[in-house]
């Protein structure tokens, strides 16, 4: 089975198009060659009817993945203009002299800025017809027309100066000039709709109508499933759990690992409705009010649209939110993001955001499933839950929304350009919601209280004051971080006896709320009530589509390979796979033999031993004369 990197296909396409552009062929021949190159790329991925028929269809990527890979290819040409763009813009500026200055300025702009300015001009020209109708109802030059004209100027800010001039003494000349703007602008709008800005290849890297219909039907099916399988969140439990996270001391998080970032990263997303990449990297937040921030850096937008700021709600104090975002981004586990976004080489065609998301989703999603107690839940669910909470909390009471419906509310707070996209963010409902609910920040430290009940037993627990000292140390640790897990490694730096530590942990296990798990290590008892309320009918996990606007990014496509050919036998792609198979075979021959890791000498006469047996992991720490004796003691501790 031969596999080809999608990056190789895209780089091959780019090289071929560049060679065509650099050739001395007539432009008509270049266009034909470019179209053929785009067709070859599409056939390799999806459209080759000879390759993808019969059983070959099983190896073909989905239409949605095809669309995402097409987007990757298109992005490589984003900064290139159409070969006739300059010539056509010059013609337009000569044909429409009243708009010549605006059109001519495009010739010195990069492609992204041209698209932005063109979009603004088109939006302005689309206002000509309604503006002309409104003006026809005003008798310009009369005494009572001034107020009406000022009101109209405020209604159409892009035309404000031209409209305001109608209140001047030479209003007739200004009116005639405005009508000329209307006349030329109406024709210009039609010509702009036919103006090709992008490189020629982009017009051939498009989905067919059948492919687009297939994708749209899948989105419709996903939406239908969501609407008929809502998820109920217990609002007080969910928010209390989120507040418990953000109220912890920052030192209580293990921010040296990606998995250690998960609790704080999810909590910040839950409180703001922002995407993972917006929280971790590209979002810019500044305090705008007690529970509002100004947000810049919306993901899944063209580069020219990312400079638009939005005012969004935070479900906690905005100052605390911004502070925690900065703390999270400056932690050691996020220090290598600049390297990650560079990718693994020229054939890594994922977006920078996609590269970050690939490593973080793997680290964060397992924690989210545990936190919510539901294997169907993932990090991005925080966005939809936030939208529902924000709607219940603010929509009916904030004057900002008095003239709009709920669809506009969801669109605005989520940053969508399309009112239909927000329909996918209504899968969650809230149970026990109350606008007057407040988090319990003064809750008694139950573990500390339970430990304090053991105080009277400590003087006789060990020789001298050893029992009292280890007990006081544990109480201090639990007071600083109520959720800390106390283990051998936690107490070893305090130089307590290696025999005393496991004895104390066993004695205080109930007070600490800990137990020895299947892996032989201490675990915290999770007695928190369920956040996701049980369904009457358990749903199977749904292969969801991340639908954010019409610009679908490739963040979820972590696999950079596709199968482009078939063979009868299966081959191992790397030698490492063969080695793993050999190890597995040996393990099958000797199922009863424990697998020890090399014992770790702690330097104080004690050893740390870990081993696996019967599919379970075991750990032991204690005094021993040598490594062999340590391994024997570890085995005896569990299997006498």
From Swiss-Prot:
Keywords: DNA replication, DNA-binding, Endonuclease, Hydrolase, Nuclease, Viral DNA replication. The active site is at residue 425. InterPro entries: ResT/TelK_cat (IPR032047), ResT/TelK_cat_sf (IPR038280), TelK_muzzle (IPR049460), TelK_N (IPR055040), TelK_stirrup (IPR049454). It is an enzyme of class 3 (hydrolase). Pfam families: ResT-TelK_cat, TelK_muzzle, TelK_N, TelK_stirrup. Residues 545-585 have a biased composition (Acidic residues). Monomer. Homodimer; in presence of DNA. This is Protelomerase. It comes from Klebsiella oxytoca phage phiKO2.
């Amino acid at each position: 089975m031969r596999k080809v990197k999608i990056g190789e296909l895209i780089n091959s396409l780019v090289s071929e198009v560049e060679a065509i552009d650099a050739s001395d062929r007539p432009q008509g021949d270049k266009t034909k060659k470019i179209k053929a190159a785009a067709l070859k790329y599409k056939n390799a991925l999806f459209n080759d009817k000879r390759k993808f028929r019969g059983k070959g269809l099983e190896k073909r990527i989905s239409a949605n993945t095809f669309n995402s890979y097409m987007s990757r290819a298109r992005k490589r040409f984003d900064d290139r203009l159409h070969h006739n763009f300059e010539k056509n813009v010059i013609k337009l500026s000569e044909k429409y002299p009243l708009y010549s200055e605006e059109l001519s300025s495009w010739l010195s702009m990069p492609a992204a800025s041209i698209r932005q300015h063109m979009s603004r001009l088109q939006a302005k020209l689309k206002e000509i017809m309604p503006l002309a109708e409104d003006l026809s109802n005003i008798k310009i030059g009369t005494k009572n027309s001034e107020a009406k004209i000022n009101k109209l100027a405020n209604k159409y800010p892009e035309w404000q100066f031209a409209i305001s001039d109608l209140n001047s003494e030479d209003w007739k000349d200004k009116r005639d000039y405005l009508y000329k703007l209307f006349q030329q602008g109406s024709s210009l709008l039609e010509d702009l709709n036919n103006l090709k800005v992008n490189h020629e290849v982009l017009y051939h890297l498009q989905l067919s109508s059948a492919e687009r219909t297939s994708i749209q039907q899948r989105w419709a099916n996903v939406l239908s499933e969501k609407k008929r399988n809502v998820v109920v969140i217990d609002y007080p439990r969910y928010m209390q759990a989120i507040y418990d996270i953000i109220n912890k001391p920052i030192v209580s998080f293990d921010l040296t690992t990606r998995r250690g970032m998960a609790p704080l990263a999810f909590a910040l997303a839950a409180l703001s409705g922002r995407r993972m990449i917006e929280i971790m990297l590209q979002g810019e937040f500044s305090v705008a009010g007690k529970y509002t921030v100004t947000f810049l850096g919306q993901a899944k937008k063209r580069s020219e649209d990312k400079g638009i700021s939005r005012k969004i709600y935070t479900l906690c104090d905005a100052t605390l939110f911004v502070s925690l975002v900065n703390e999270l981004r400056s932690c050691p586990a996020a220090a290598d993001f600049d390297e990650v976004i560079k990718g693994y080489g020229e054939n890594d065609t994922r977006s920078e955001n996609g590269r970050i998301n690939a490593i973080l989703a793997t680290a964060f999603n397992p924690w989210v499933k545990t936190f919510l107690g539901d294997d169907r839940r993932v990090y991005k669910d925080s966005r939809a839950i936030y939208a529902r909470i924000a709607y219940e909390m603010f929509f009916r009471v904030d004057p900002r929304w008095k003239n709009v419906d709920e669809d506009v509310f969801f669109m605005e707070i989520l940053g969508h350009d399309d009112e239909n996209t927000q329909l996918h963010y209504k899968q969650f409902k809230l149970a026990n919601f109350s606008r007057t609910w407040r988090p319990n920040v003064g809750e008694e430290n139950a573990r500390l209280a339970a430990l304090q009940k053991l105080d009277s037993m400590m003087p006789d627990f060990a020789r001298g004051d050893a029992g009292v000292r280890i007990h006081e140390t544990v109480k201090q640790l639990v007071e600083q971080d109520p959720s800390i897990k106390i283990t051998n490694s936690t107490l070893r730096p305090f130089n307590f006896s290696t025999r005393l530590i496991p004895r104390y942990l066993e004695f205080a296990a109930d007070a600490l709320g800990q137990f020895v798990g299947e892996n032989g290590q201490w675990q915290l008892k999770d007695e928190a009530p369920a956040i996701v309320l049980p369904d009457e009918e358990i749903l199977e996990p749904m292969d969801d589509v991340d639908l954010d606007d019409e610009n679908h990014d490739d963040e979820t496509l972590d696999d950079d390979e596709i199968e482009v050919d078939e063979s009868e036998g299966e081959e191992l792609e790397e030698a490492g796979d063969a080695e793993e198979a050999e190890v597995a075979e040996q393990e099958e021959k000797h199922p009863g033999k424990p697998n020890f890791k090399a014992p770790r000498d702690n330097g104080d006469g004690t050893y740390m031993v870990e081993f696996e047996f019967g599919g379970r992991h075991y750990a032991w720490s204690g005094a021993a004369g040598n490594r062999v004796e340590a391994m024997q003691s570890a085995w005896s501790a569990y299997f006498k």
